[in-house]
Amino acid sequence: NLHILAEDIKERLGVFSFYVDNIHHNLITILLNDRFGIQLRGGCSCAGTYGHFLLDVDFKLSKEITDRIDSGDLSMKPGWIRLSLHPTMTDDELLEIIGAINQTVENIEEWKKDYCYDKHTNEFHHIGFPDEVKKEYTHWFKLSL
């Protein structure tokens, strides 16, 4: 089941945050990027406190999550997927995105086999991604202005 956060708010910007039951938000994010070229953001962004409210994270669970994070294990860190829609986006483009999300959910068991999860970063990495390519693109982000 796909859940849109704050779905009761009808007047909103073209930004939708959602999650799918029993599928890690960062796995969906990387699959939509790698398979369809759809750029999304996974995690809780800068809305951790609001996220606790939206996801019904109580104090006890929050404490358990932060204790795990403090020990270097981010695997319990909650999050969602954020989709931003551009005003010039067509209905067909939106339907393609919806179709890609549906395909990802339908094929998750097969497609996730191509990825490994790192609990220290809470990210998924393609198991066949060459190290030299990874080194090159991470270098781009380290360039100083």
Where are these regions (language model features)?
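Short, conserved charged micro-motifs
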Residues: I23-T29, T88-E96
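Surface-exposed acidic, glycine/proline-enriched linker/cap segments
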Residues: D58-M76, W80
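Structural preference for beta-strand elements that scaffold enzyme active sites
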Residues: V15, Q39, W80-R82
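Short secondary-structure transition/capping segments
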Residues: G51-D56
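Conserved small-domain helix->loop->beta segment predominantly found in fold-type I
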Residues: N1-I30, R41-S45, Y50, I69-S75, ...
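A common structural junction motif
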Residues: R35-R41, I101-E109
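Short, low-order "capping/linker" segments at domain edges
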Residues: V57-E64, N122-K142
